[in-house]
């Protein structure tokens, strides 16, 4: 795809539904007593993988309606490229008698599963393998577990869902991306799950109630459009609730640190450009924002440092991917173990790679809009992983 620079970006969009909440709602509907309706679900490659997964466990899915089985049954889960699908399915398989096989695409086979596997083994499940493909044979025999969550909060969220299935005490050690755990808990509450907590130690009681659940808008995908407003003009994104706990709400604070003007409405966010200055940021609790924050840093005056310790375990090695692409655009970048040091300026048009990573594709598309010449973004089809309509929305802002 060729993207040419523009003079400004102005407009208004509706945020797509949240991918993270959609995943959680479908898995809870699998475990529920009674039928559930998932309103406003995100339809993308990752959430389709989750729908296929809950079907393999015995759920009936007809559009937005989920009819749970009397008891989930073992089966085969192919998670495509969805880490959430793979990890939640692995955890829930621990509560099922019989063997479940979980597998995924090549990059997903490289992503960490070890913390979750060790936790399930500690609960008495039989698990063959520490990365995909792996088999899980339940049911678990113990009701208390401590999990190393330093590589992914999804290990914790998966065990919380297992707790809603069988009852469980879960202690999360060194958790990253903590807001995603809060999102899991909030969705559990919507499905009537009862739990107690002290910090990041939880006691979850079994029992999930079928419900009608409306998926909120997605701050994560909205961040790319809001960044375009900060860099090139003014953008408003609707369907973003102020009273939410999504991880990427912190992206708005980061934009303000850079110097952008941010207005938070009850159900919208508006961002307008300002004089952008370099910042030092740790986005370990909202790592999905790292690629687009690196782009903002490339246009900000001065030297920024953007960090997040789990970045190398995502759909791509996002530290390396952004270092390669920004360097091709003439940006001075130094790669750190857990992030990037970026000297801001005016990127030039270039041919860049997406590394088959949806967030790299989206971030570099926004970067290209302000470059000194046209850019070629390779393999943009990866955006279908989280927002198939991304480029349609971007064109609306450029009309």
UniProtKB/Swiss-Prot annotation:
3-phosphoshikimate binds at residues 19-20, 24, 152-154, 288, 310, 314. It catalyses: 3-phosphoshikimate + phosphoenolpyruvate = 5-O-(1-carboxyvinyl)-3-phosphoshikimate + phosphate. InterPro entries: Enolpyruvate_Tfrase_dom, Enolpyruvate_Tfrase_sf, EPSP_synthase, EPSP_synthase_CS, RNA3'P_cycl/enolpyr_Trfase_a/b. The active site is at 288 (proton acceptor). Its EC number is 2.5.1.19. One of its GO terms (cellular component) is cytoplasm. The keyword Phosphoprotein does not apply. It is an enzyme of class 2 (transferase). SUPFAM superfamilies: EPT/RTPC-like. One of its GO terms (biological process) is chorismate biosynthetic process. Disulfide bonds: none annotated. GO terms for molecular function: 3-phosphoshikimate 1-carboxyvinyltransferase activity. It comes from the Archaea. Pfam families: EPSP_synthase (PF00275). Pathway: Metabolic intermediate biosynthesis; chorismate biosynthesis. It is found in: Cytoplasm. Gene3D superfamilies: Enolpyruvate transferase domain. Phosphoenolpyruvate binds at residues 19, 83, 111, 154, 318, 359, 385. Catalyzes the transfer of the enolpyruvyl moiety of phosphoenolpyruvate (PEP) to the 5-hydroxyl of shikimate-3-phosphate (S3P) to produce enolpyruvyl shikimate-3-phosphate and inorganic phosphate. Belongs to the EPSP synthase family. Monomer. This is 3-phosphoshikimate 1-carboxyvinyltransferase. It comes from Thermococcus kodakarensis (strain ATCC BAA-918 / JCM 12380 / KOD1).
């Amino acid at each position: 795809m060729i993207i040419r620079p523009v003079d400004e970006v102005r407009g208004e969009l509706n945020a797509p539904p949240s991918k993270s909440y959609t995943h959680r709602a479908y898995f809870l509907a699998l475990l529920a007593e009674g039928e559930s309706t998932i309103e406003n679900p995100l339809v993308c490659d990752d959430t389709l993988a989750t729908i296929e997964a809950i079907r393999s466990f015995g759920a009936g899915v007809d559009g937005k309606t989920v009819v749970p089985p009397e008891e989930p049954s073992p089966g085969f889960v192919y998670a495509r490229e969805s880490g959430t699908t793979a990890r939640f399915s692995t955890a829930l398989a621990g509560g099922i008698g019989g063997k479940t096989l979980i597998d995924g695409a090549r990059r997903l086979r490289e992503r960490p599963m070890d913390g979750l596997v060790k936790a399930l083994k500690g609960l008495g499940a039989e698990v063959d393998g520490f990365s995909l493909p792996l088999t899980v044979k339940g049911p678990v025999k113990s009701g208390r577990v401590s999990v190393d969550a330093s590589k992914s909060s999804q290990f914790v969220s998966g065990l919380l869902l297992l707790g809603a299935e069988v009852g469980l005490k879960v202690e999360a050690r060194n958790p990253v991306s903590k807001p995603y755990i809060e999102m899991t808990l909030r969705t559990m509450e919507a499905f009537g799950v009862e739990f107690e907590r002290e910090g990041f130690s939880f006691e979850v009681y079994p029992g999930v109630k079928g419900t009608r659940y409306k998926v909120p808008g997605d701050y994560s995908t909205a961040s790319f459009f809001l960044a375009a407003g900060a860099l090139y003009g003014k953008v408003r994104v609707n369907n973003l609730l102020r009273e939410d706990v999504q991880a990427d709400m912190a992206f708005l604070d980061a934009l303000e640190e850079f110097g952008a003007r941010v207005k938070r409405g009850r159900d919208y966010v508006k961002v307008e450009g300002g004089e952008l200055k370099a910042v030092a940021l740790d986005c370990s609790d909202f790592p999905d924002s790292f690629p687009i924050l690196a782009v903002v840093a490339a246009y900000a005056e001065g030297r920024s440092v953007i960090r997040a310790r789990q970045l190398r375990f995502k759909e791509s090695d996002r530290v390396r991917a952004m270092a390669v692409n920004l360097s091709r655009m003439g940006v001075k970048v130094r790669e750190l173990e857990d992030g990037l040091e970026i000297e801001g300026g005016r990127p030039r048009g270039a041919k860049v790679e997406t590394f088959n990573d949806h967030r790299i594709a989206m971030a570099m598309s926004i970067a290209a809009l302000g470059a000194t010449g046209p850019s070629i973004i390779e393999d943009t089809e990866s955006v279908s992983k989280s927002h198939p309509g991304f480029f349609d929305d971007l064109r609306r802002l450029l009309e």
